[in-house]
């Protein structure tokens, strides 16, 4: 168990070094436990949330999270507009109905910077984040996706998909090219 914990901590440290635009999952053990408990009540797989959010734009990243005490599925999307320029949104998908609950425009700060980096990565991708996430879940029976974040390894686009099964967490790297 200690070895598994060490591997998870190292994975979090890799994410914190800046290779990816944002941390994919909560850092503390208590936060991970709380998120894992909340996921039990969410029937909607992350990869389905990516598909649902696609009506608002191209999905750039997705994560189940607890924000301000509320459990939610958040997906960043991007939509090209030749007249007004690119637009970025955070789509909150209702995990109990599988419908879009809310769409918020991302206009500045760290969220906009992260969305722009994610767009640059996904522009190099030959496959969608949803496909990569589904592949990671299929290859890891019994696990479900908690987050999917695009990043670059040099110039190669990839997705880091965080998976959970009970209290076991792992991060899978999936190529997007």
Language-model features, listed with the residues they occupy:
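Long, terminal "pre-/pro-" and other extracytoplasmic accessory regions
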Residues: 2-6, 18-177
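Bacterial N-terminal signal peptides
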Residues: 8-16
